[in-house]
Amino acid sequence: MAARLCCQLDPARDVLCLRPVGAESSGRTLPGSLGAVPPPSSSAVPADNGSHLSLRGLPVCSFSSAGPCALRFTSARRMETTVNAPWSLPTVLHKRTLGLSGRSMTWIEDYIKDCVFKDWEELGEEIRLKVFVLGGCRHKLVCSPAPCNFFTSA
């Protein structure tokens, strides 16, 4: 299952704010040194009712006030470049979804910081993150007439 997330870096607290598109989420806590995700302010994350998006592939928890229940994500722009890495992030995440991988998720924090924060700081990309992959959720789909692809395109 996959869903789209809005996100923005809060430089004052050095945290990444994530929420599902179309949800009035209070945010989620990311474990480790990334810190807690604060509730998005109206100026930090633009309001989006998601009316232009298809609901297919969005788990029910995407519209929960607490946000999605499982965050398994990477920058969609990095999806193609991870295949030559020592571990392919999409493959690892898919295996975790199927319960086949024992790898700890602590390494994902370093991956995110390297791919996200470093590029923001060094390349000056303000709109760095557009689409994140969210998977591993066990909730039913809002619309499930057809099987949902694990990774969706932008």
Curated annotation (Swiss-Prot):
Residues 28-48 are annotated as: Disordered. It holds the Pfam family X. GO terms for cellular component: host cell mitochondrion; host cell nucleus. It is found in: Host cytoplasm; Host nucleus; Host mitochondrion. Keywords: Activation of host NF-kappa-B by virus, Activator, Apoptosis, Host cytoplasm, Host G2/M cell cycle arrest by virus, Host mitochondrion, Host nucleus, Host-virus interaction, Modulation of host cell cycle by virus, Transcription, Transcription regulation. Disulfide bonds: none annotated. The keyword Transmembrane does not apply. Signal peptide: none annotated. A fraction may be phosphorylated in insect cells and HepG2 cells, a human hepatoblastoma cell line. Phosphorylated in vitro by host protein kinase C or mitogen-activated protein kinase. N-acetylated in insect cells. It comes from the Viruses. Residues 68-117 are annotated as: Mitochondrial targeting sequence. Its main location: host cell. Residues 30-46 have a biased composition (Low complexity). GO terms for biological process: DNA-templated transcription; symbiont-mediated activation of host NF-kappaB cascade; symbiont-mediated arrest of host cell cycle during G2/M transition; viral genome replication. InterPro entries: Transactivation_prot_X (IPR000236). HAMAP family: HBV_X. Belongs to the orthohepadnavirus protein X family. Multifunctional protein that plays a role in silencing host antiviral defenses and promoting viral transcription. Does not seem to be essential for HBV infection. May be directly involved in development of cirrhosis and liver cancer (hepatocellular carcinoma). Most of cytosolic activities involve modulation of cytosolic calcium. The effect on apoptosis is controversial depending on the cell types in which the studies have been conducted. May induce apoptosis by localizing in mitochondria and causing loss of mitochondrial membrane potential. May form homodimer. May interact with host CEBPA, CFLAR, CREB1, DDB1, E4F1, HBXIP, HSPD1/HSP60, NFKBIA, POLR2E and SMAD4. Interacts with host SMC5-SMC6 complex and induces its degradation. Interacts with host TRPC4AP; leading to prevent ubiquitination of TRPC4AP. Interacts with host PLSCR1; this interaction promotes ubiquitination and degradation of HBx and impairs HBx-mediated cell proliferation. This is Protein X. The gene is X.
